[in-house]
Design a protein with these regions (language model features):
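A short helix-breaking turn/cap at a secondary-structure junction
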Residues: 190-275, 294, 439-468
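Gly/Ser-rich catalytic/binding loops embedded in alpha/beta enzyme cores
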Residues: 2-174, 278-284, 361, 492-493
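Acyltransferase
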Residues: 19-27, 56, 265-291, 315-321, ...
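Short glycine/serine-rich loop segments
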Residues: 102-228, 402-415, 421-426
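Short helix-loop capping/hinge segments that flank enzyme active sites or metal/cofactor-binding pockets
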Residues: 69-92, 250-256, 306-360, 365, ...
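Residue-level signal for inorganic ion chemistry
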Residues: 29, 221, 253, 280, ...
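Serine-dependent amide/ester hydrolase catalytic core
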Residues: 10-16, 31, 121, 247-248, ...
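Glycine-aromatic micro-motifs
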Residues: 442-447, 452-601
């Protein structure tokens, strides 16, 4: 007996126990797929015959259970991503072509033992966040067929939430790999742009497109991402990962301030967002309200600025001869770019960089952002009556993410007070924090505790839990000119340093103002037996390479040694050679360098 949701950890456990085989799983997939009442989920399902043949072939070539990372795992593919042997249409029948090769990501997943169960429906040419812009019909919410599934990766999200795929591939330009996750009680893994190859994908906005992963748990999604990722020289937008870390303690989480909160009248989603804030606070995070304005203005550039011309560039030749084959709303959006000029494109780029600079103020005080995935939802009828404006509501908190080069993980946040529809939140951080975000996203998902996909009662498997990654960041205690707001603080912030906490040393340290230093610097020494109140200091973290460079620049008579803090911990920090204190003014009684400097102002 298979679970309702075919999560990766559960299937692997069943395979390891010999309880089921890939062929058994495929038979259940065939049965569930046929019985599902929503017939708009797939554009081209893999035939029953081919599914059985794929399972049998896998078992013959790799008979040992779990001998491949995704051995016997069923997955669906959005129909703007190539699968050899199945047509690619981008939800436009006249655009159909038959690829001879898999997309790079699909090839990697198949090589790892995963089995494609079909090509899924989408908003045509991945233009939309709602799922209604397709000639094949609109996939629906698995919780209420009156409601949209979310898009553009509509069918992909349903396959996982309904229980006939373990994971599914989507794409994400403006939120298409995150909004459907929120509406289907799923996880949406939105990698750093360039982490997954886009070769074999029909572009929407090629410079910011990402292949994404829908999964039941964060652990499942990360496991799939690790198989799929990797530099691809054939893709000019592919990037080699330069992994970044997040603080393991003292994490600062940015949340919407009052002025930028907009839920379009949906108080239920707002309550779930507030609950998520309290949940992440319970995990030890410091909550930091921030001004969303520059992020919102960057988001507006995707559809209201020159980036819409990138959608025209993707299909320019085809729309010139086949305009009548387009969904009317999609056609209107793409043809609206025809008047855009190169001057507008450059001005748009300049504006984006201005806004990026403005967002640096937020990233200086927050390590991660926690935002609603979508501030509201609508019925299919409501969406069709007002397709552009209501669609834009879904993207209010998603459209900026790729433009500003961020990683994101969308997770379920629970259900409304009537236990009817789900909502989600998204954790967002700068590029290549993908791995660092995962443990936090997993912990937050587990606190929501509302199952997986359509199975609200399901328990997230312990086997899929994402462990906290050990930090390689190096802590350092600063005493004087490197404190926040002091002249040399930029030597910490420039190479990616993060303030962890303000605290005090143990009581046996003394502080002196060193004569002739520019900018003025203190010297701190430890004197066993001295009974003071401790000195005000800050603990920062630096990447290892930056720490080494930082220490190498420290001028005599200063150096680095272990400093004992008032909590008994010992951390590397600034100390002074005793010879330099001859004739120096003692300023210990001020309690710290900042207070001493203020006393001289």
């Amino acid at each position: 007996m298979l679970p309702i949701i075919l999560d990766l950890a559960s299937l692997k456990a069943l395979y390891a126990a010999g309880t089921v085989t890939p062929l058994d799983v495929i038979e259940v997939v065939i049965e569930r797929r046929a019985a599902w009442p929503d017939k708009a989920v797939f554009i081209t399902p893999t035939s029953d015959y081919d599914l059985r043949a794929a399972a049998k072939s896998l078992m013959e070539k790799s008979p040992q259970p779990n001998s491949l990372p995704l051995w016997g795992i069923p997955f669906a593919v959005k129909d703007n991503i190539d699968v050899a042997g199945l047509p690619t249409t981008a939800a436009c029948p006249a655009f159909e072509y038959r690829p001879e090769a898999d997309a790079t990501v699909v090839a990697r997943l198949r090589a790892a033992g995963a089995i494609v169960i079909g090509k899924t429906n989408l908003d045509q040419f991945a233009t939309g966040l709602n799922g209604t812009r397709s000639p094949h019909g609109a996939p629906r919410s698995v919780f209420d067929p009156a409601y949209v599934s979310g898009g553009s990766s509509s069918g992909s999200s349903v396959t996982v939430a309904a229980g006939f795929a373990t994971f599914a591939l989507g794409t994400d330009t403006a939120g298409s790999g995150r909004v459907p996750a929120a509406f289907q009680n799923l996880v949406g893994i939105k990698p750093t742009p360039g982490l997954l190859s886009n070769i074999g994908t029909v572009p929407a906005c090629r410079s910011v497109d990402c292949i994404t992963i829908f999964a039941a748990t964060v652990g499942d999604g990360v496991a799939v991402r690790k198989v799929a990722e990797g530099f691809d020289a054939a893709d000019p937008f592919s990037r080699r990962a330069n992994w970044a870390e997040l603080p393991t303690t003292g994490l600062r989480v940015g949340v919407l301030d009052g002025a930028e909160r907009e839920f379009f009248g949906n108080e239920e989603v707002e309550k779930l967002y507030d609950a998520a804030i309290e949940n992440i606070r319970s995990l030890g995070a410091t909550i930091v309200p921030f001004d969303y304005t520059p992020f919102r203005e960057a988001a507006a550039l995707l559809y209201d600025g020159p980036w819409v011309a990138e959608r025209l560039a993707a299909v320019e030749g085809f729309i010139a001869t086949n305009a009548d084959d387009f969904d009317p709303t999609v056609r209107g959006i793409i043809e609206g770019a025809k008047g855009r000029t190169a001057v507008e494109a450059f001005n748009g780029k300049y504006r984006l960089e201005e806004l990026r600079r403005k967002t640096e103020a937020t990233w200086a005080k927050a390590d991660v952002l926690l935002l609603p995935t979508s501030p509201t939802t609508y019925t299919v009828e409501e969406m069709l009556a007002d397709p552009v404006r209501k669609n834009s509501h879904f993207g209010r908190y998603t459209n900026f993410v790729n433009l500003l080069d961020c990683a994101a993980i969308a997770i379920p946040a629970g259900f409304d007070s009537e236990d009817h529809l789900p909502a989600g939140v998204t954790l967002i951080a700068p590029a290549f924090t993908d791995d660092a975000l995962a443990p936090l996203a997993d912990a937050l998902h587990r606190l929501a505790a509302r199952g997986m996909g359509r199975d609200k009662a399901a328990t997230l498997p312990e086997a899929s839990k994402v462990p906290a990654a050990p930090s390689s960041l190096v802590p350092i205690v600063v005493v004087g000119a490197h404190l926040t707001g002091m002249p040399l603080n930029k030597e910490l912030t420039g190479p990616g340093g993060r303030l962890i906490k303000s605290c005090r040393t143990a009581g046996d340290y003394r502080l002196y103002a060193l004569p002739g230093t520019v900018p003025p610097k203190p010297g701190m020494v430890r004197e066993p037996g001295f009974a003071g109140e401790g000195l005000a200091v800050e603990v920062w973290e630096l990447p290892p390479a930056a720490f080494g460079q930082f220490v190498a620049r420290i001028p005599a008579p200063l150096g680095v040694g272990k400093i004992t803090l008032d909590d008994g911990s010992a951390i590397s920090g600034f100390l002074c050679e005793p010879y330099a204190l001859v004739g120096a003014e003692e300023v210990t009684h001020h309690g710290g360098w900042r207070a001493y400097v203020a006393s001289r102002a």
